[in-house]
Amino acid sequence: MSPRPEDDDLVIEPADDEGLHYGNASMEGTSTGQRPYIRLTSQLRNATKSSGDEVRFKCEALGTPPLKFIWLKNNGPVEKTKRVKIRDKENSSRLVITQLDVLDSGYYQCIVSNPAASVNTTSVLRVNNVPDAVKLSQKKGSHHSTKHIAFDEYEDYEMMDRGRLPDEEDADLYRVPDSAAGSNYAPVAVSERWLDGIKYRVGDCVQYRGEACRQYLSNKFVMMTNESREEMYDIDRNLRAAMLFINGAPTISQKCRQLSQAVACHHMYKVCESDSNNQIVSICKHDCDVIQNDECPSELALAAQHELVGDTPKALFPLCSRLSSTSNCIPVMSTALQSSPVAEVNRGHLTHWCYVNSGTQYEGTVAQTSSGKQCAPWIDSTSRDFNVHRFPELMNSKNYCRNPGGKKSRPWCYSKPMGQEEYCDVPQCPSDMYPHLNDKKVEGSTKGGVSESVTALWDSLDPTMQVALVGGGVFFSLLLLLLFCCACCCRAKKKSQKTRHQNAHCSSAPSVINSAANSAYYRKLNGTSTPIMGRVPPHVEMTSLLPSAQHLGPPPYPMDQHLQQARRFPSQEPIDDNSYKVFEITPSQLSVREKIGEGQFGVVHSGIYTSGLFAPEPMAVAVKKCRHDATNAERAQLEQEIRAVATFDHPNVIKLIGVCYMDNSLLAVFEYMVHGDLHELLKVRVPPADHDMGGITEANAEFLYIATQIALGMEYLASMSFVHRDLATRNCLVGDTRTIKIADFGLMRTSYGSDYYKMLHRSWMPVRWMSKEAIEQGRFSEASDVWSFGVTLWEIWSFGRQPYEGASNQQVIELVANRHLLECPHNCPTNIYSLMVECWHENIERRPTFSEIRSRLQSWSLASPAHSILQQHNNRAGSHSGSSGAGRPPTHQRGYPSQKLHRRVEGASPLMKRHDANYAYSEDGDSD
């Protein structure tokens, strides 16, 4: 075991560098001058406990300066309570949780940091629920044999096992991480870590397998002269940078480039005679004198001015006077001239180790992002802005990092597998290196010269003058903005006054109002956009357009009068109606087929839409319309729903194709997925009893893909301030390639009658998917949709089972009120069920948002699909992993009669509402 710092002032730095992260001696907080380092000495173990038990985690590390410990649960800080205690010491930290609850399940991470680096270790805690009867028997049996152990009595925990598995102890003993050298060093590629896997000891001779001096030191042995592998990698790194600078300098001859590289390699690396003989062979003194005096005198003089000659660690060339005249030496003259000449550097391109300015001319071979993901080939890019057709130079760039067109601040690429734009882990060249490779404007353009002149003029100004100019510009911009706002307000005021005057004038002309011909004329005049969307200002409610009773005569058609009146008042002023413009479909383009379902506020039919802009061939659609006996309020409700969904444009939300006037009725035409809904797909995919682990892994990967799409769609709806109120698998339609689209047709389908319950003074409600505040108070918000999303996840991983199956709807209401949560589905990953429990948090402020859920699901999809699968071999009968109290009645018990199915023909209302405030039911029970 490695030495550990004791309690006195003596700090012992480990003798080896196994798993060490080093920093720079000049880092902040290193007052002793000692090189900062950090190493994690133990790993957290996964734990499975029962509710009521306690768990103890210990995190240990070594390092200097002093270490800082942070505990996280599911990426959030662990809060200290009466049950949760944290004690930090100099080199360890302990987390103790007593009286465990199923809500304590999750990922626990210990992060240790100091100025050198930051390391971490993670454990998965799973807490299983234990029935009350079992708890009582355990408590009685152990009352006289055990006692509660105080937190201060855990001192013997210091000597416990450090949590390291045997295979973890022996694996990768000598592997150094990419970040071991600190943030100021450019990481070395994995293929260039030629010392990894070798027992490192100062003074040993090791065969050189590096990159910088491969041309001269191949198959030769070099002495390990530095304290760690990383410092030996620094030699290769510095040599590569220096040689690239020399090769790019136009004043250095081709011969001197070859000679300087050979001399630098044999000087910075101490060459041994053999692996068994540790005697160093130096450069021949005669060759050194010839190079210094005859071949490259000016180049060596320039190097001496920059302190590159001598025996310092940065010196590339030796002092010839200090070399011995022995015959056992290295003839660098013949070695350099016999090797292949150094290729001329293309002045228009950059070398592979760093980039200049924004990296427009970078042509290196780095193919990894800063987050460690592999880059996707440019030829596979489907982006309209960055592809091989727009930038032909990307054709031969494979999957290397580039900055085509200089649109980004540094080289980047599309990362696998999601195709996200990410910056690459490429260092930037020093500011004074490669001045001829600075980004230039296109030749023949005068804009580049003007911008450079302005930049030079700005740099020449005094800082006080620069601040004054910036302040004046900001003040002038604010003044212009204020004047513009005043002008807009005045124009809007005049416009509203003129509109009121025109409306008053139009109301005195009943012959025009009651003319159906004029109504059709104005529709034709205004184009194909539906007048109800484009001719009513957005802030006017549709119910306000209902005419007064004294002006209503016998309607010429059975359609609602306020819809006709909205058509008869074409605005004399142009109105910005882009947000509500809906495509109008002619009756000849739409064929209405069989009825799919029926609710209080409408009927849904399947249909075929032809000759449309959205599809050159016939496409399946869903047609929603009012019932033939619908009231004006119900027709206005359909109108309001069209307003709501008209602006929706997202690949995971059902899209309104247009509206159609057929048989004097208004029809809303939606896209429809011919593969049915997600619930039907899940029931078909129920696995057999003897399914293997491979099938579970494949199913989990597909489920995660489906859940991510639902989260994306709900995130979009939340950003549009809309609340769905009925999110479930029955309302998720399945398209080609498993594309999921969120809809709200489930309420209208009789096959899902058992999913809804007619509540007192309310409509039919999906109580099995509703949160406590939605059931008891009628409060709907994004938080209540998040609760429904958690139940939808439960549906997915249980292959379409009904939540709380076996219990009646009234019993479900009581279970939700008493915090009886759904149990963890069989073979459900721990992180997925942990997310479900977070969605069901009693405090709505503690539930995650859809943006957080989407981000978390996307990050999990990048990991191995089987990453979080925990086998559930224990007997699950009678247990309830998601409850904070007594277990919910197990499914399919005879003591709980199944709910009688009711066919709903009334009481429903549109499910998606604008979320201007938390939606609440009124006292009279009306849902609007």
Curated annotation (Swiss-Prot):
It comes from the Eukaryota. Residues 1-466 are extracellular. The keyword Kinase applies. Its cofactor is Mg(2+). Residues 36-126 form the Ig-like C2-type domain. The chain crosses the membrane at residues 467-487. Disruption phenotype: RNAi-mediated knockdown in a lin-17 n671 mutant background causes 8 percent of animals to produce more than 22 vulval cells (overinduction). It is found in: Cell membrane; Cell projection, Axon; Cell projection, Dendrite; Perikaryon. Residues 200-332 form the FZ domain. Residues 590-870 form the Protein kinase domain. GO terms for cellular component: axon; cell projection; dendrite; neuromuscular junction; neuron projection; neuronal cell body membrane; perikaryon; plasma membrane. Residues 1-34, 873-928 are annotated as: Disordered. Glycans are attached at N24, N46, N91, N120, N226. Residues 873-888 have a biased composition (Low complexity). PANTHER family: TYROSINE-PROTEIN KINASE RECEPTOR, TYROSINE-PROTEIN KINASE TRANSMEMBRANE RECEPTOR ROR. This is Tyrosine-protein kinase receptor cam-1. The gene is cam-1.
